[in-house]
């Protein structure tokens, strides 16, 4: 199906065409691990970690650790990395043998040198001393490298959105260059007004559009948002509602402004109803297949 056929369909038929061409993934090879970030986070405490190698395999490891941290308290700053925590100040619930509960806070960024024993007790109870004594076999730098790679997997959801933004930006850049259009990534309403003298009504004062494209010949702006959902959930309903509302705000502009939504992912199969409602209000909803087939270029072309 080409752009003109798609855009001429009734909203239900456009939705069916959209759903039939959803991509199975947007995960590029770079999605899985950001090695630059892993390297950067590991190197932060390389010196401390190499010093802590001293504790590997020690018999009386509690006493050795207490002495080491008493003499070099700054080494404690590396502990959060060893227990896979991004937090540098930890709130801890302690439960004793009588089931009495108490709370404490240990700051691993600003070390309290009067509480070294408390730090070591926590490290012991967290299982780290046992690991160092009985399981660690080589460099703690290498170990933390692996920990950081695991922690980085938590950022994959963010990378999925970043991937879509990157695809959109590369696509828009090529089209704009070929058609003599101006464009801006992460464009704000204030930028659009100051640079192109186009009024953009928005639902949020700090709204940034993933891309804005401007035609000098038409004095027109296309506002583009993009996202990707590999799984279902309540967020998809909220997003569909948000962009439906945003598209209606955009239509109130006294200037020539058009809203475009580029979205994809198998998650939409679980949220068809709210997406159907969005299709009833937003004419230009495209997926990655449609981008690949030139729908965005055709959208700009039909009015230039």
UniProtKB/Swiss-Prot annotation:
One of its GO terms (molecular function) is type II site-specific deoxyribonuclease activity. The keyword Amino-acid biosynthesis does not apply. It catalyses: Endonucleolytic cleavage of DNA to give specific double-stranded fragments with terminal 5'-phosphates. InterPro entries: Restrct_endonuc_II_DpnII, Restrct_endonuc_II_DpnII-like. Its EC number is 3.1.21.4. Pfam families: DpnII. The LlaDCHI restriction system has two different methylases. Genes encoded on plasmid pSQR700 confer strong resistance to the three most common lactococcal phage species (936, c2, and P335). Its presence is probably one reason for the strong bacteriophage resistance shown by strain DCH-4 over the years. Belongs to the DpnII type II restriction endonuclease family. This is Type II restriction enzyme LlaDCHI. It comes from Lactococcus lactis subsp. cremoris.
